[in-house]
Each structure stands twice: as C-alpha cells, then as structure tokens.
C-alpha cells in the first residue's frame, strides 16, 4: 500500500483513542490509469510480435489486475474487508483486528484503531521476550487456513506494516 497510500498516526478530535489513518496518495488514480494503459500497450506489442504469447493471456491478466488495483483504491472496500475479518475472528485469541472508525472513513481515507505490538520483522525483540517463533508461525498458518477454509474469505494485506506480535 505504500505506493498507493500514506499512513499516519493521529488522535481523533474529542476522543482518547489513538488511530492510524491511511490516505490515498494525491493523483494516484491518474497514475494507475496511466500505468494500466502502458501495460495494455505492452501486452498488445508482446502479442503482436511473439506468436507464443497467446498462451500467456496477457489481455486477461492485465484486465484482472486492473479490476484488482481499482478495488484497492477504494478504502471503503478495505474497511469492509477489515470489518468482516474482525467479525470472523471475534472469538480468536490468535488474531486481533483493529476497529474501523466508519465516521472517519471514506473512499480515500481509512481510519483504524491503532494496534500496539512488536513489528513482525523484529526477530531480536521477539527472542529477547521469549516469543516462540515456531508457535507464532504455526498460528499464522492456522489463521490463514481458517480464512481460506472456514470463512471462505481471505483478507490478503499481510505485509510487515500490518502484522504485529504481542
């Protein structure tokens, strides 16, 4: 998301809760449209000059990517996905999903409860605290499998900026 949005910490006016605010970058829609046009032109040229390229189905791949990237540019969709995942794991001790502040969320701005914890990349701190990384990995796999097979709903924004250990 770093290429699409910026993330800032804040405090809501008149509230005591700390939040994280994700804001789409200025002109990001224009940039994405331009990039898609370049991809389509590149795909056309590859198909034009390489007979074997037909099996790659570049037109379809680019079309699917276009649909996916424009969904990522609607932060209300991300907020809804976060809410569904929070509900799906409401009884779990393995995963904490932040609350969405819907009154402060739009297509271009997502406001979430701030989460405390160690960055999942801070191996040294986890080792110093005696966190068993094998159990952590097993729990991660269980969470993934629950999303796929139990919930049939996979919120796939798993990157180090979104995963904290506590």
Segments from the language model and where they lie:
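Conserved catalytic cores of large enzyme domains
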Residues: 1-166
